[in-house]
């Protein structure tokens, strides 16, 4: 029997993601038309082009590097969401775990003078501990991980502000410049910066994040541990009756998820690309954007690499829109539309499954009708 391409999981994920992207860009274009029709076409092209807006190849390379620098932490947050989701958990607390990674890595670098490796390990441990708290509450107190995650997000945000106030600049609310205070805490460039017009921020974080995506795929798809995690996600009771430690799996999955988010924070702030604003009153969007990247990537670690780059590419491209025609927030609006539509990826996959099932049912009915007709004609021929 010919295989229906609409039943292929890979094809469904790819098509659903492409539909979300096209629809998001189209809605963004409509918004631009409503605000100022004269510059809508040029504005949406600017968003898509991002660093290609620059005419000089050297500038294009440099700002392409900046996009990759911001893609690495987004990818790590997406992997954090994906890992927990495979166990049937929705780790909305990834934003707080990311905050914990920021706080511990920057304090260790600026306040304690540690090198980049112990700073990153401390960020990983901070995210893991925070994730394990949600896991313990879920396993032993039946507290929904979404509720505990949201509460912890705000607690950790204000703890981060309090801790990093001790290492901020005197005349501004931002933390001190990492390269000026402790150069040993800056992630090594591995010579990659030279490939992007001597971009000082491009370095270890980019290849390391891709390696982590491959590692997550191997763990989930090729190991006994990954099989047990997914089995727990499909049916917790069935996993328990099969001898699997379902409570342990829940705790470990959220712990690993938190570790990935914390590592993502270190990948950004230990490059020196950004400084933390100690007066911030909102949780970083990186953790929430990771949700969109995970779903846009079809909940596949390898697909998430491309999805993370696309979301960051569009977000960065919005900054180049002509501010004389559109307000500064228009780039965030366009990015938000695309990110919002990423939530419909699973809905689109369900619609494609329904369509494929109906097509198969019609084909089966036609085959049975043709078979019945052939038998009837054969019977008539025998009677003659």
Predicted feature locations:
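Single transmembrane alpha-helix segments in multi-pass membrane proteins
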Residues: 32-37, 53-111, 124, 128-143, ...
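Cytosolic-side transmembrane-helix boundaries in multi-pass membrane proteins
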Residues: 1-21, 234, 241, 245-248, ...
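Hydrophobic alpha-helical segments embedded in the membrane of multi-pass proteins
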Residues: 71-82, 97-103, 125-132, 154, ...
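Helix-loop-helix "hairpin" substructures at the membrane interface of multi-pass membrane proteins
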Residues: 129, 196-276, 302
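Short loop segments and helix-boundary regions at transmembrane helix junctions
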Residues: 4-15, 85-92, 111-116, 120-182, ...
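Transmembrane helix-bundle core of multi-pass membrane transporters
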Residues: 50, 57, 145, 153-222, ...
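Transmembrane alpha-helical segments in multi-pass inner-membrane proteins
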Residues: 260-261, 270-336
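Membrane-interfacial amphipathic/re-entrant helices at transmembrane-helix boundaries
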Residues: 2-76
């Amino acid at each position: 029997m010919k295989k229906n391409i609409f039943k292929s999981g890979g094809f469904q994920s790819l098509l659903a993601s492409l539909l979300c992207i096209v629809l998001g860009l189209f809605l963004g274009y409509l918004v631009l038309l409503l605000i100022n029709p004269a510059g809508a076409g040029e504005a949406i092209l600017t968003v898509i082009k991002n660093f290609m807006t620059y005419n000089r190849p050297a500038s294009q390379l440099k700002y392409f590097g900046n996009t990759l620098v911001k893609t690495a932490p987004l990818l790590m947050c997406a992997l954090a969401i994906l890992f927990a989701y495979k166990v049937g958990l929705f780790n909305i607390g990834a934003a707080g775990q990311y905050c914990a990674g920021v706080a511990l890595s920057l304090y260790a670098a600026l306040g304690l003078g540690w090198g980049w490796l112990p700073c990153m390990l401390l960020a990983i441990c901070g995210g893991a501990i925070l994730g394990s708290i949600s896991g313990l509450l879920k396993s032993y107190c039946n507290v929904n991980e979404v509720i505990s995650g949201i509460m912890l997000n705000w607690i950790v945000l204000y703890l981060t502000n309090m801790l990093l106030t001790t290492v901020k600049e005197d005349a501004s609310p931002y933390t001190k410049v990492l390269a000026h205070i402790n150069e040993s805490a800056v992630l090594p460039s591995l010579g990659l910066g030279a490939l992007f017009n001597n971009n000082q921020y491009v370095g270890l974080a980019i290849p390391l994040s891709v390696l982590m995506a491959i590692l997550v795929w191997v763990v989930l798809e090729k190991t006994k541990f990954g099989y047990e995690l997914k089995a727990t996600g499909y049916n917790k009771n069935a996993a328990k009756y099969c001898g699997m430690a379902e409570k342990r799996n829940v705790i470990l999955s959220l712990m690993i998820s938190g570790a990935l988010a914390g590592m993502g924070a270190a990948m950004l702030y230990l490059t020196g690309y950004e400084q933390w604003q100690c007066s911030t009153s909102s949780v970083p969007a990186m953790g929430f954007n990771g949700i969109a990247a995970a779903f846009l990537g079809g909940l596949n670690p390898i697909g998430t690499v491309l999805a993370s780059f696309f979301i960051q590419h569009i977000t960065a491209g919005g900054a180049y829109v002509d501010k004389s025609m559109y307000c500064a927030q228009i780039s965030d609006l366009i990015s938000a539309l695309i990110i919002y539509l990423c939530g419909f990826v699973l809905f689109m996959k369900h619609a494609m499954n329904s369509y494929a099932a109906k097509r198969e049912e019609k084909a089966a009915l036609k085959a049975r009708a043709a078979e019945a007709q052939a038998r009837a004609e054969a019977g008539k021929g025998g009677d003659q």
